[in-house]
Amino acid sequence: MLRSMWNFLKRHKKKCIFLGTVLGGVYILGKYGQKKIREIQEREAAEYIAQARRQYHFESNQRTCNMTVLSMLPTLREALMQQLNSESLTALLKNRPSNKLEIWEDLKIISFTRSIVAVYSTCMLVVLLRVQLNIIGGYIYLDNATVGKNGTTVLAPPDVQQQYLSSIQHLLGDGLTELVTVIKQAVQRILGSVSLKHSLSLLDLEQKLKEIRILVEQHRSPSWIDKDVSKSSLCQYMMPDEETPLAAQAYGLSPRDITTIKLLNETRDMLESPDFSTVLNTCLNRGFSRLLDNMAEFFRPTEQDLQHGNSINSLSSVSLPLAKIIPIVNGQIHSVCSDTPSHFVQDLLMMEQVKDFAANVYEAFSTPQQLEK
């Protein structure tokens, strides 16, 4: 039996070698294919897990953004009410002073200024925090993903995060003061000559707000005169000029300071981008629209108006003397800067443009390529 098999192999030696080679090749290719398929499956699973983890971190970061905005609104409201103290003027009016008309004129300017600044600063706060927290959120995600690997250093340690995020104080401090000055000048120019007895409809108010916005958004401080016109001039109220106090220290900068300066420069680049300008402008449009909606309930037609056949839906059907509009405008700050979720703030936080912009910022700063910069 063995001899006959051996003779068979000798007679068909080449065929057997060929067959063995083919079978061996098929076996090796099969094993190689299985290995590659397993590697691809493992890589896809790892990518899916990483993407799911990043998505979860992003969504968690957005909730943090929303809570941070709400937590900072009382500080913003207090700063505004301190700089534009209309309550002291209304208290004076209760005593019927001899200069009552002069006080009413001051109250007119301060009331409109306060509500308009409230809209601007709240919109800025929402979008600026979206930028800052998604930049730092991207760095934190990378830190969590790479910690302990190949001796990678932490990109954004807690002390850097704190130092970087403290830059929001510019908007609540010097930036807000400058914004108040610019808006007050614009209000004075548009409404200063309007008599307290002059009646205005909701449509008239909308037009006045548009005129004030044009003046405010065209204003550029000396340091912004040479800037590209495509860059929003409102950035000057959100971040200080190019040379930050840290960068001004030519010597003795710690690694923490250098990292913070890098983060601030990246933030400034983002604020000066066309996308940021578009998103902020969209927020402002929504904010002023909501402000008018809040005041619309005071412009409902009376029974007498209805009897005269005035159109209920017309924005110009009901007019009020400016003196009666002032208290309405004056009280809007409590709705605009409300730390409890209000329609005004919720509208801004839930806007799709804001969400998409936040996602783009996070995507840009949470990719591994960020480590190579």
Swiss-Prot record:
Q: Where in the cell is it found?
A: Peroxisome membrane
Matching entries from Pfam families are given as:
Peroxin-3 (PF04882)
Question: Gene Ontology cellular component?
Answer: peroxisomal membrane; peroxisome
In this UniProt entry, which residues form the Peroxisomal topological domain(s)? 37-116
In the record, what terms sit under GO molecular function?
Answer: protein-macromolecule adaptor activity
A Gene Ontology annotation in the biological process aspect, one of them, is: peroxisome organization
Classification via InterPro entries = Peroxin-3 (IPR006966)
User: What ranges does the record give for the region Interaction with PEX19, renumbered to this chain?
Assistant: 120-136
- Family the entry assigns: Belongs to the peroxin-3 family.
Name of the protein? Peroxisomal biogenesis factor 3
Cite the source lineage.
Eukaryota, Metazoa, Chordata, Craniata, Vertebrata
